Design a protein with these regions (language model features):
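Extended, low-polarity transmembrane helix blocks
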Residues: 1-60, 74-90, 96-155
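Perimembrane loop-to-helix junctions flanking transmembrane segments
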Residues: 63-75
Length: 155
């Protein structure tokens, strides 16, 4: 004996099934949002962390680069080198954890702007700036410590 599925035998259930499928498709951006923001945090954090490791590996050369090559305006080269290295090593860890994501992304965005406008204009910096701006606006996403803390505090 052949039986038909309810979606095929009853037109109203077919419509409900189609509406259900459309509703699930509508939530797809929300479903993909959490992994997207996690990947964005991991990737941009890695970019800056590797840069910080490079700076700390030979800090004397880093200071010379800040004094002669980068010529950062306003700040003394030693302070600029130290603070850039510290931000490049601390902020990525915060981004990876999703802890204080917005605050961690701000110094990295400022550094990106300084690099872009004072030293080396490069298209890649625009991509970094877009991701960091998104993290500042959106936050770390559902897969972040910020989200877990917010859930606990009901913020």
């Amino acid at each position: 004996m052949l039986t038909q599925t309810p979606a095929r035998s009853n037109p109203s259930s077919a419509v409900r099934y189609d509406v259900y499928r459309l509703a699930r498709l509508y939530t797809l951006p929300e479903v993909l949002s959490a992994p997207w923001w996690l990947m964005a945090r991991l990737w941009i954090g890695w970019v800056f962390f590797v840069s910080g490791l490079t700076k700390i590996a030979d800090f004397d050369t880093t200071i010379l680069l800040f004094a002669d090559e980068y010529q950062v305006p306003v700040l003394p080269p030693e302070f600029a080198a130290f603070s850039a290295t510290a931000f490049e090593l601390i902020c990525p860890v915060l981004l990876w954890l999703g802890l204080g994501t917005r605050l961690a992304a701000i110094p990295l965005l400022v550094m990106t702007a300084v690099i872009q406008f004072t030293y080396l204009a490069h298209d890649q910096h625009l991509f970094w700036a877009i991701i960091l701006t998104g993290l500042i606006i959106h936050g770390g996403g559902k897969w972040s410590a910020d989200h877990l803390i917010g859930q606990r505090l009901k913020v």
